[in-house]
Amino acid sequence: MNLTLVLNGERRVMEAVRTVAELVAALGLDPRKVAVERNLEIVPRSAYGATELADGDQVEIVHFIGGG
């Protein structure tokens, strides 16, 4: 199933992605090091697997980067 998402401001077609967890994995990201917002609502990490995506969803993913 293909979904068209607005991902970090860019329109992207994602294949075989149904949930936030699948999206994070498809992008090769470590779920422990990102925060995800779907349609202006923060998605708790514990809900990534249960949060289904729909065509046209707006998703923002922010990476945590350590520094000093």
Regions found by a protein language model. Name each.
Residues M1-G67:
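Ubiquitin-like/PB1-type beta-grasp interaction modules and other compact soluble beta-rich domains
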